Amino acid sequence: MDRPELAGVHPADGHPDHPRLAPPYIERDADTVLRQAVHENGFVLIVGESTAGKTRLAYEVARSCFPRYAFVRPMARPALAHAIQVAKRCRRAVLWLDDLENYLGVDGVTTSALAELIQRRPGRVVVLATMRSQEVRRYEAREESRLTGSDRDAWRVQREVLHMAAQVQLERRWSVGEQDRAEAHKADPRIGLALTSCDRFGLAEVVAAGPELLAAWQNAWAPGANPRGAAIVAAAVDCRRSGLRRPVSRQWLQDFHLPYLAERGGPDLQPEPFDEAMRWACTAAYATSGLLIGNYSQGYVAFDYLLNAPQLLPVPDHLWDALLSQAEPVDAYDMGLLAHQSNRLEQATAALERAWQGGVSGADFLLAIAVGDRGRPREAARALEGVMRRRRAQLGPHHPDTLASVHQWAFFIGEAGDAETAATAFGELVAAATAALGAGHADTLAARHQQAYFTGEAGDTEAAVQQLTALLSDRTELEGPDHPQVLAGRRSLIWFSSLTGDLAAAEQQLRQLVVDAQRALAAEDPHMLAIRSTQADFIARAGRAHEATGLFTQLATERSNLLGRDHPHALHTRLQRVQGLMSTGGHEQARQELDQIVEDAQRVLEPGHHHLSFAHHLLSQLQLP
């Protein structure tokens, strides 16, 4: 194969003398690393930003290293299973998974399928994949909706696929060495032009016309320009940002773009006819990918460079709701997974409900988690009890998916108020996970953390401290001192130690943890927010009410902005702020805020939720003379 665009490389503006000729390949700094990786590993993933040159790098290395191998590229997720069978039948094959995120999810790639393909014929089959950095970050170890290590079950299959791959990072901005190598090809006008912009953009980014296409979209909103085309592109971009992994039909774009156009001014923008708008969006005056890629029969997707445009607003409800109403159950699962990862829990439950009703495998499990995370732990535990029963019958008691369902069931049993049962269940799970997965497996370590947490919540603080001390030692050795789970373990240990020990000493330990966490975590990271919340709680317990109230006020704002005002974490922090207001004499302000919090909480939390109990306790205190 001698045409890189057939492998998924973004087309470049045509050469004036040879319009179909691709730009010359310029060796990247990552070239040597990738060559070594493909010879040492059966599965290699190249990670970088849109238009960084990931696909071209993979294509050139594959052609060089595997010239006699068959090239097997499934064009969409439904074709993946057949592509794997084709790769198995070939004497030698490269399985090509450009934009790996499109092959993750229901009926998508799994570690077992890849392992069977690679291990049965070592060296005969190589899996080469690419993925945008933004997509990879969705699956990094993090816990948005809980802080003791179990959210990973919601997207374990996808994360395990990424962990199976040897990852090679590719920078978007070109190094001095890469620019020097490009100088040898500056006679090609496309390379010459790109070299003049390397102070702001990557060379491959310019060759693919990424900045020009983005500017064309932004400028098209002007009255009399192409405002309808811009609205169509906005709808297509947000379809991808909502989690849709397949092309959108022309009819969908015709329906979905109307609110975008209306929000910008509607008729005042002098919008062009729809057919003209579609032609503009697909050609965009550049001989590259266009703002939309596709055609009438196959559907359309937005150029992925646009997904990282600066200052994109959140996906509007009108698009999300309209898309979900039209989506197939499999699409709804993808949308629900992304919504859950993004803490849009109301949207997650709606999408996963649709997927579950449509019979999508695994939707029952993820739906139960989303329901519980939204503040209905008893309902989640009841649903997970059924999931556990089915998985034990179908997969056996020691299968990782069965153990994951036990983990989630035990967690929500504890969240519903039965900490003692949860601690016992996690103790049994630790033994089962150790036997089935190993003592150092992430699931085993997560179960140990939960066992310690609920042991402490059940009242045995001393045992919780002992368990957390042992866990922290093991995690630090396995994962290093800056791993988010190590930092989370330190926070839990400091908290439970403070309940029976010296509060001043615990506060000093927490101050050091804040310093360490700031070095390793982003300011909005959930672990960082949890550490700051514990710090504010210590300050309140030490009697510095005004200082604590100020910290809780800041945290309430940040968590509400990040998660939504009615997320359980945000509700709890808002209640802590009210408690601070009460302790500093702001009773009238506290009463007003508490009334609003109770209204918000009753809308999303199940009756008897511990946040509601806390709110009613504060209300009763405010009513005392």
Model-assigned labels for residue ranges:
Residues 333-625:
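Intrinsic-disorder-linked linear interaction elements in eukaryotic regulatory proteins
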Residues 235, 239-353, 358:
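C-terminal leucine-rich, beta-strand-based interaction scaffolds used for sensing/assembly
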Residues 41-57:
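Walker A/P-loop nucleotide-binding motif
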Residues 73-76, 86-110, 114, 126-135:
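Conserved P-loop NTPase "ATPase switch" module shared by AAA+ and STAND
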Residues 152-203:
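Conserved small helical "lid"/interfacial subdomain of P-loop NTPases
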Residues 118-152:
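Sensor-1/coupling segment of RecA-like P-loop NTPase cores
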Residues 34-41:
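Phosphate-binding P-loop
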Residues 1-29, 33, 60:
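Charged, amphipathic alpha-helical interface modules that flank catalytic cores or transmembrane segments
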